[in-house]
Structures are given as C-alpha cells and as structure tokens.
Amino acid sequence: MSAADGTPQFRQLWPTQFMSLRLPGNEQANPVLADFLLTQNVENDDMTTNYTASNLFVSDHPAVIWLRQCCDRAVLDYAGEMGISYEVEWVLQGWGNVNMKGDYHNLHNHPHSWLSGTYYVAIPDQSDSSMFRSDLNPA
C-alpha cells in the first residue's frame, strides 16, 4: 500500500501502533543527506557503532534540519493518532548508521524512549533477495 508524500499511514499491530511515512521532499533531500552521512562516516570511524557519542539532530546542515523538522512533525502526528491532546515535550536523538555489503544490524530495543523511529536514506534493490530477517524472535 502506498500513500502520497506527507500522508502518514497507521497500522495497529499488537499493542504497538506503527506509523509509516514517505517524507515530503525526500527526492531532493535524500541524496544530500546521503552525501553528508557518508562524509561523516569517513571522518568518524565509530559513527555507526558509537551512537551515544553524538546526536545527528544538533547539526546545522540543511538536510539534517529538514530531517529534524520532518521528525518533529511525525512525533506530533503519532501523538495525535494515539489520542494525546495535551502538549507533549520531547528531545530528538539520532545517529547515522551506514551499512556496507555484509554488514548487519542486531535486533534491539530502546527502553528509555517512548517513541523510536528509523529513516532509510537509501536501501539496496531488494527485488531478487529473499527475506533478509525473520522476526520470529523480535527484540
């Protein structure tokens, strides 16, 4: 199922509500954001693994500012869908995760977060691959 850019889709799975969203302006922002993250990955050996060392969202890079604004909007959309009608305060914390061929991402959770999300700047072609992960034992 596909939705227009900027229109969130909500799915009630288990007691957890999932939200998917194609960010408006992603076609222009993603290449710029990818270049920025790849440069950061080259300059910082532990960028992907040392996620507590920095916060991507404090950057003043235009593509990161765009992503931060989109994430703030997504938090408001999610909270509204959950029926939260009062003012909510939050802090965005994020990091770039650059995976090369053969890399993997362990199953995990974020126990100190009331909301977690992932934004994929680029993904490889999945047309000829089988399921890349089984969630029979989710984190």
Each language-model region and where it sits:
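Non-heme Fe(II)/2-oxoglutarate
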Residues: 2-84
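A generic structural micro-feature
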Residues: 13, 86-88, 109-113
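A short coil-to-beta-strand element that immediately follows conserved catalytic motifs
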Residues: 84-94
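Catalytic core of non-heme Fe(II) oxygenases with the double-stranded beta-helix
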Residues: 93-139
